[in-house]
A protein has these predicted regions:
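Short intrinsically disordered, low-complexity coil segments enriched in acidic
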Residues: 1-6, 113, 173-175
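Sec-dependent, cleavable N-terminal signal peptides
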Residues: 1-18
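Signature of Gram-negative chaperone-usher
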Residues: 14-170
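Negatively charged
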Residues: 169-507
Length: 507
């Protein structure tokens, strides 16, 4: 019987750190030895030798770990053997018990199969991470082999190389979070005004422009830092009172906006125009009140702006009183859940491009277009409303809106439709299609003061769960055709008053 007296595996490692991030790595065993005689005398003639490697890196894009033999030779070689005895690498993935005699392989982590030993020219990627480690992080590798009685005695050795390389990383300029930006930049305007509704609320009345500077500010200027703690570059800002301009400067080509960019320009009531092309929104999750109360904002450019991760657009353009044209065709809203008050109070808006909107995840559309007084045509034919729960005031107070087609709306989850079309004075017909109202509990003032409405077919309405229909049709003074489903089961509503020019009827 052959005796393999000693098996030596010698490990070394290559560690590379790119750019400024740091990376350290270690292996808990650099010289693995196996008593071949014990393996051959065992029941299944196999053995597993686990060992750990530990990595610590602050690189934000993580690292890649690879494994290979030191040379093109992947076998464990008996250098004293005249016959060239060796333990070959397996050639395909196999479980330990299925390894051929006198072969070896490796496996990573919890894998059940062993893989062939890779040659130097074709290293195997065993792990690739996407972010920095949480302190020291360890992972396990295992060597497996199966030996046979015919193995020639001697020392069988090879060397494996574990390499750890920082993933490529591009230096970034990252803006501080929205509320912090708002507070810091707002204080640059030392002569702030105050809100008419609350004298304690500061309004940035003198900041009219926010622009990128191509040169660093002079040391004599009052300069603030507005970068996030994770930013690789400084972002400096200062205020030129004479022109009403907040300038910002960074060495990066673009500034990545913070994932929390809520309230970024909130209450910048003096802001007149904004170009977003120097900002990258790819990491933003929250844009709540982004431009809220920017009551003098007349122009904003969102061309190419990335909103793919945003979940909250609540009040994004709330009370933008003078903005007339808004093109959001570049917006990716596929992850947005909240759109309540998004355009509320845009009283001068006449053109709104929502052609790219994907609203499949939106749950709240309360006040979405409330008080958008001058727009005549609104195209929401691409809206996916299958998950919307609340549409209260959604289209209310759209004083100049002449027609509205929501026949594509899936309202099967909507619970609140109160005031939905209230004060829409110029709409003559509403196209509902087969609107599903089976979950709706309140329809109060739903069609209130739709003065021009001449015909309305709500025969598809299921009002079995409605508990409030107060003044649902109040002020619908020109209607001549109203189609109701009298068997609709308004059992939870005591009475429904319909007011028309010629009659009042209770159902």
């Amino acid at each position: 019987m052959a005796l393999a007296s000693c098996l030596n595996l010698v490990f070394s490692k290559n560690t590379f750190a790119l750019y400024t991030p740091t990376l350290s790595a270690s292996v808990n065993q650099t010289n693995l030895q196996v008593n071949g005689n014990s393996v051959i005398n065992s029941t299944d003639k196999t053995t597993e030798i686990p060992f750990n490697f530990t990595v610590n890196t602050n690189n934000r894009t993580g690292y890649t770990a690879t494994l290979s033999s030191e040379t093109e030779n992947t076998a464990l070689t008996n250098t004293s053997s005249a016959a060239g005895a060796k333990i070959d690498s397996i050639s395909t993935d196999l479980s330990l018990n299925n390894l051929p005699n006198n072969t070896w392989g490796y496996k990573f982590g919890v894998s059940t199969n062993y893989a062939p030993i890779p040659a130097l020219s074709t290293p195997a990627q065993i792990l690739q991470t996407a972010g920095k480690t949480n302190g020291n992080e360890s992972n396990q590798l295992s060597i497996g082999m199966k030996l046979a009685d015919n193995l020639e005695s001697g020392n069988y050795t090879n060397k494996l190389i574990l390499s750890f390389v920082s993933n490529p990383y591009t230096m970034r300029a990252v803006m501080t979070n929205g509320p912090d930006f708002n507070a810091r930049v707002g204080k640059l305007d030392v002569n702030t005004g105050f809100a008419s509704w609350d004298s304690s609320v500061a309004m940035m009345t003198n900041i009219r422009y926010v622009k990128k500077s191509t040169i660093r500010p002079s040391v004599s200027q009052a300069i603030i830092n507005i970068e996030d703690s994770d930013s690789d570059y400084e972002i400096l800002a200062w205020f030129d009172a004479a022109s009403g301009t907040v300038y910002y400067y960074t060495d990066a080509e673009k500034i990545e906006l913070n994932k929390n960019s809520s309230y970024l320009f909130h209450n910048f009531s003096g802001l007149q125009e904004m170009d977003m092309q120097n900002f990258d929104g790819k990491n933003i999750e929250n844009m709540r009140d982004f431009f809220a109360n920017c009551s003098n904002l007349a122009s904003v450019n969102f061309a190419g702006f990335n909103t793919g991760k945003v979940t909250d657009m609540t009040g994004m353009f709330y009370a933008n009183f003078v903005l007339k044209n808004l093109d959001l065709s570049s917006f990716d809203t596929s992850n947005v859940v909240y759109m309540n008050d998004m355009f509320s109070g845009m009283r001068e808006l006449v053109n709104l491009n929502l052609s790219s909107f994907n609203t499949g995840k939106v749950e709240i559309m309360v006040n979405m277009f409330y008080d958008v007084r001058k727009i005549k045509n609104l195209n929401v034919s691409n809206f996916d409303t299958r998950n919307v729960k609340k549409t209260r005031n959604m289209f209310a107070n759209m004083l100049e809106l002449e027609s509205l087609d929501i026949s594509n709306f899936d309202t099967s989850k909507v619970e609140d439709m109160a005031y939905m079309f209230s004060q829409d004075h110029k709409i003559k017909t509403l196209n509902f299609g087969n609107l599903n109202t089976s979950r709706v509990t309140t329809m109060e003032y739903m069609f209130q003061n739709m003065w021009a409405l001449e015909s309305l077919d709500v025969s598809s309405f299921d009002t079995s769960n409605v508990t409030n229909m107060k003044d649902m049709f109040n002020g619908v003074t020109k209607i001549t055709t109203l189609i109701l489903k009298l068997s609709c089961g308004m059992t939870k509503q005591r009475k429904l008053l319909i007011t028309t020019p010629s009659r009042e009827r209770y159902f």
